[in-house]
């Protein structure tokens, strides 16, 4: 099953919000909870499956940056019912990244029930 990644809202105090961005009204629901923050990159949100990959939109048009991503995804043995989501930084957007370890940065992995796996699995805690 192919699943569209939902939009991530900006924090209310973000300085880079555009007219089509969603933003949180408040951050009060984070008070007293452990949170993990990551840097927002200027790329293309992409999902990798064992036999398929797509941008955030399930029907996104073909682009050379997706060819690179497909080549990357076939190098790994992704479990049948899982998907790996991350930012595809291969194509140049408003920011041109250099000196990256990879043009694909993973930010979440989802199981067959569409549950996001705990980051504790990936980070030494």
Predicted regions and their residues:
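Non-transmembrane, aqueous-exposed alpha-helical and coiled segments at domain scale
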Residues: 31, 69-102, 109-111
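Short, surface-exposed beta-strand/loop "edge" segments at domain boundaries and coil↔beta transitions
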Residues: 59-64, 94-95, 114-117
């Amino acid at each position: 099953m192919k699943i569209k990644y939902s939009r991530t809202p900006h924090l209310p105090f973000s300085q880079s919000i555009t007219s089509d961005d969603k933003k949180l009204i408040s951050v009060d629901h984070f008070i007293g909870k452990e949170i993990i923050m990551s840097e927002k990159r200027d790329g293309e949100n992409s999902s990798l499956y064992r036999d398929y990959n797509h941008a955030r939109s399930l029907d996104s048009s073909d682009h050379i940056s997706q060819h690179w991503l497909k080549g990357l995804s076939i190098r790994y043995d992704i479990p049948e019912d899982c998907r790996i989501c991350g930012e595809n930084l291969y194509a140049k957007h408003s920011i041109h990244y250099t000196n990256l370890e990879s043009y694909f940065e993973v930010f979440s992995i989802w199981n067959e029930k569409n549950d996001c796996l705990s980051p504790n699995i990936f980070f030494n805690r």
